[in-house]
């Protein structure tokens, strides 16, 4: 009888023992290795800067190579590192004794860990992407992308997400030398220098809140402070504040949105800042295969040749993915930031050509926000028109193809602003890109 009772107790306890063993053997760690190879052919016949008569177009293939290492220890720690090489085909010789491409760089390298319940922190080099890239974006179109050295503290519940960002940048300028000294052991003061290719700010403080007050309705609020210094007054901090709202909504086949941002404080030269950005769009899905978007962007600007102006009214989308908004040929807020601002009405038509492909066409009309004095054809605010055509096709799970053609017709006022002469009437750009993103290895242990 005792044996029967013991056997029954053992069988009853067995599932609990097995479950406990399974819980003990549940992997706490995971590791994923992924990669990206993205070559892009470009025929630049006026991209970035309009070509003048007699100038030849640029023909090249640029390439991005990334290797991503993503480690998780349960929900207690994430460590992410993205190594990157950016080059032009032919930049490195066939027999490569020295790496002329600049070698490997670290695109992202951060650790993320919980602080308390719904509060977590991410520290290190990381992308900052907010509200469809208008003010903070990844700049993914550029072969190198954009990342910040920063601390990111997040809190989230069902409907509300709070994100904060803090950064302090430092580089050392060698007195009369023309380059930044990368020596981390430099004992001299703190001389921060802003120059092309270096950091656009010394310190950054930003808070972003997003609230979903309905499943298809969301509102965001951003306040950001940019601490700037220039080489002439390096002991003085010029702080510029950006404050704004971003709204997106959807109802059946209709999608709509609006955003507004105000900039105040000082610009990098120490001049008072008083600028704003307004944007709105409406998108309608006519059929499962066809949609249209009508939108308008307005970035305030200054009048030209106004000696009485005491304030800088030019809005600065300092870390936005501006390629996405103001024309794919990058004539506005990429290669050139117009002090006169920009009015940009646009129309986008998107056609789904197959289960794996779609075709998109966008037309832009560019006009200055501020007055342009001395334009010979008296169209004192007309800056030009642009058309962008893009075809996307997913070849397989990890491979996609993109190709595009853009045409830009600058006005005489635009050429005058950029001090360009004898400019061709039409500028165009042709490109084709292959994006390969395989997951190479994944394991739990």
Regions found by a protein language model. Give the residues of each.
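C-terminal structural cap/anchor segments
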Residues: 298-387
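Transmembrane beta-strand segments of Gram-negative outer membrane beta-barrel proteins
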Residues: 23-48, 75-81, 217
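Cleavable N-terminal export/targeting peptides
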Residues: 1-26, 439-445
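Signature for the C-terminal beta-barrel architecture of outer-membrane proteins
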Residues: 117-121, 139-308, 347, 352, ...
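Surface-exposed loop and membrane-interface regions of Gram-negative outer-membrane beta-barrel proteins
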Residues: 49-63, 73-116, 130-139, 266-273, ...
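Outer-membrane beta-barrel "beta-signal"
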Residues: 424-445
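Extracellular/periplasm-exposed beta-strand and loop segments of Gram-negative cell-envelope proteins
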Residues: 56-58, 196-198, 249, 271, ...
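Sequence/structural signature of outer-membrane beta-barrel proteins
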Residues: 40-48, 88-94, 126-139, 167-173, ...
């Amino acid at each position: 009888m005792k044996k029967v009772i013991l056997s029954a107790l053992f069988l009853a306890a067995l599932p609990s023992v097995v479950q406990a063993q399974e819980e003990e053997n549940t992997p706490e760690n995971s590791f994923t290795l992924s990669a990206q190879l993205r070559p892009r052919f470009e025929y630049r016949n006026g991209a970035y800067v309009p070509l003048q008569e007699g100038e030849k177009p640029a023909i090249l293939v640029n390439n991005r190579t990334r290797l991503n290492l993503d480690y998780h220890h349960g929900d207690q720690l994430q460590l992410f590192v993205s190594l990157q090489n950016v080059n032009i085909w032919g930049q490195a010789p066939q027999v490569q004794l020295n790496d002329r491409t600049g070698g490997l760089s670290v695109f992202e390298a951060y650790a993320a860990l919980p602080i308390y319940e719904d509060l977590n922190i991410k520290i290190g080099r990381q992308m900052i992407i907010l509200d469809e890239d208008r003010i903070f974006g990844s700049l993914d179109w550029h072969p190198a992308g954009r990342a910040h050295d920063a601390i990111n503290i997040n809190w989230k519940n069902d409907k509300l997400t709070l994100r904060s960002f803090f950064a302090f940048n430092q580089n050392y300028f060698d007195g009369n030398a023309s380059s930044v000294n990368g020596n981390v052991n430099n004992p001299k003061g703190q001389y921060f220098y802003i120059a092309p290719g270096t950091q656009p700010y010394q310190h950054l403080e930003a808070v972003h809140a997003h609230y979903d007050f309905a499943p298809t309705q969301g509102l965001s609020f951003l306040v950001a402070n940019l601490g700037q210094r220039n080489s002439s007054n390096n002991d003085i901090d010029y702080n510029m504040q950006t404050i704004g709202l971003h709204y997106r909504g959807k109802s059946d086949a209709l999608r709509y949105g609006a955003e507004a941002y105000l900039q105040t404080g000082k610009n990098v030269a120490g001049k008072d800042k008083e600028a704003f950005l307004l944007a709105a769009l409406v998108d309608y899905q006519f059929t499962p295969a066809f949609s249209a978007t009508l939108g308008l962007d307005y970035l305030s600007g200054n009048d030209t040749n106004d000696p009485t102006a005491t304030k800088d009214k030019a809005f600065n989308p300092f870390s936005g993915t501006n390629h996405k908004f103001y024309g794919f040929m990058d004539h506005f807020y990429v290669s050139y930031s117009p002090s006169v601002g920009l009015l940009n009405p646009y129309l986008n038509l998107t056609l789904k050509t197959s289960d794996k492909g779609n075709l998109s066409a966008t037309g832009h009309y560019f006009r200055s926000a501020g007055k342009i004095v001395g334009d010979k054809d008296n169209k004192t605010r007309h800056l030009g028109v642009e058309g962008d055509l893009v075809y996307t096709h997913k070849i397989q799970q990890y491979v996609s193809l993109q190709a595009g053609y853009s045409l830009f017709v600058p006005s005489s006022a635009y050429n005058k602003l950029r001090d360009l002469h004898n400019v061709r009437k039409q500028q165009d750009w042709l490109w084709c890109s292959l994006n390969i993103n395989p997951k190479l290895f994944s394991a739990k242990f």
